């Protein structure tokens, strides 16, 4: 079965993106990688060069990033906007997506303003005080995401309504896994099983990759280093 149903919403378990060379397929993956990096580690320095540089005025324009996700059988939309050339956050938001096409605001943030909690988020007085303190601290912070700050050494119970910040953050941290052609294999255990290796070879043959066989050979480190480019060998060693 290629579909999964969550709250009467049918979702594909997998999808494939097709397109001509240089049509933007890789950029889709890079955008997701960029969002994950911003949430987990902060805005990278190289973001300054990521805007569309074919026009000079683009340096001052906003770029908008948003994902719709499923976590704990609930649907969320999370996103942020920034002026890439300045590494400056201009907006940030999170909504719970409800049945019937409605959306309930979790929080919104505009440049120079503290984040605002959604009116329908019913939290305790203690949690509301916590949120307000955290939000006020972000008023003039244009280089960090509020989602990141809400997951940095904050004492938020899993039973609190504010735990939604932890759930969305956890999706970026643990559920969004990105592999690129240069990602090294770190676990070869699957290949040491004869049945698994046979399955791998059968799949590779059906993909028409030009690879005829995958097998396990015992080689010395010297043999491996002599057969591979230095950078690939170092990836394997590390």
What are these regions (language model features)?
Residues 1-40:
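Pre-Walker A-like glycine/lysine-rich segment at the N-terminus of P-loop NTPase domains
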Residues 2, 59-62, 100:
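Short solvent-exposed loop/turn micro-motifs enriched in small/polar/acidic residues
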Residues 9, 15, 65, 145, ...:
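A broad, low-specificity signal marking well-ordered, structured residues that form hydrophobic/aromatic
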Residues 9-11, 54, 174-180:
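Short amphipathic alpha-helical segments, especially helix-boundary/capping motifs
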Residues 10, 29-87:
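Conserved P-loop NTP-binding catalytic core
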Residues 14-15, 43-48, 57-60, 124-127, ...:
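A short linear-motif detector with a strong N-terminal bias
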Residues 26, 71, 191-195:
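Residue-level detector of secondary-structure boundary/capping sites
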Residues 77-236:
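Electropositive, glycine-dotted interaction segments
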